[in-house]
């Protein structure tokens, strides 16, 4: 490296996250796209409230994939699954897979939910807006759940199922994406409870 030349850090040494744009203004401050080589902070951002927003989106996805019973605590294995899935996404869509992940998160996070309100012994559902942080958490959970359910008792690997889920969610395809289907279901229930 020559003097004065900038060091370019790419995710897994392959993908640049500086060109990725977040279209949803409410999620801009909650989606971290800081350049990292390997998305592993070893829990540094779990001490304070809302510090998880400083964590790279791919690491948050890895943490949600680790929450399943099979992959609990196996971060290296999950990161290799995500790397393989991002390679499949890049080959299939011919665009930056980190952009596909961000688009999938924007399309699969519900904007409206219901909460249970008890008034005078009578309980009913009330529609409420969802905070951007909860919206992202729900999107991560549904994407990882859709991928693990797709791979369960299937010939497809978890990486292929994750790639399918990310591509379908980035296109907001309700027929193929578990996460988008769940989002639409929650918003439909919330709309009926207005």
UniProtKB/Swiss-Prot annotation:
Source taxonomy: Archaea, Methanobacteriati, Methanobacteriota, Methanomada group, Methanococci
Protein's name in the database: Small ribosomal subunit protein uS7
Family from the record: Belongs to the universal ribosomal protein uS7 family.
Coiled coil: none
Regions crossing the membrane: none
Keywords: Ribonucleoprotein, Ribosomal protein, RNA-binding, rRNA-binding
CDD domains in alphabetical order: uS7_Eukaryote
Gene coding for it: rps7
A Gene Ontology BP annotation from the UniProt entry: translation
Keyword RNA-binding: yes
Record flagged with keyword Ribonucleoprotein: yes
Subunit-level organization: Part of the 30S ribosomal subunit.
An example Gene Ontology molecular-function term: structural constituent of ribosome
GO cellular component: small ribosomal subunit
Function: One of the primary rRNA binding proteins, it binds directly to 16S rRNA where it nucleates assembly of the head domain of the 30S subunit. Is located at the subunit interface close to the decoding center.
InterPro entries in UniProt: Ribosomal_uS7, Ribosomal_uS7_arc, Ribosomal_uS7_CS, Ribosomal_uS7_dom, Ribosomal_uS7_dom_sf, Ribosomal_uS7_euk/arc
């Amino acid at each position: 490296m020559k003097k004065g030349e900038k060091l370019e850090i790419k995710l897994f040494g392959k993908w640049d996250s500086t060109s990725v744009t977040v279209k949803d203004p409410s999620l801009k401050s909650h989606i971290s796209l800081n350049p990292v080589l390997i998305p592993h902070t070893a829990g540094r951002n779990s001490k304070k409230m809302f510090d998880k927003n400083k964590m790279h989106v791919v690491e948050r996805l890895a943490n949600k994939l680790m929450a399943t019973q099979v992959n609990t605590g196996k971060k290296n294995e999950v990161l290799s699954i995500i790397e393989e899935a991002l390679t499949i996404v890049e080959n299939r869509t011919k665009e930056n897979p980190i952009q596909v992940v961000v688009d999938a998160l924007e399309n699969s996070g519900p904007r409206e939910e219901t909460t249970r309100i008890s008034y005078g012994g009578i309980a009913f559902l009330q529609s409420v807006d969802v905070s951007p942080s909860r919206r992202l958490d729900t999107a991560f959970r549904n994407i990882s759940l859709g991928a693990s359910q797709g791979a369960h008792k299937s010939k497809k690997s978890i990486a292929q199922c994750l790639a399918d889920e990310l591509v379908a969610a980035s296109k907001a395809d309700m027929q193929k994406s578990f996460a988008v289907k769940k989002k639409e279901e929650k918003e439909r229930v919330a709309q009926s409870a207005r």
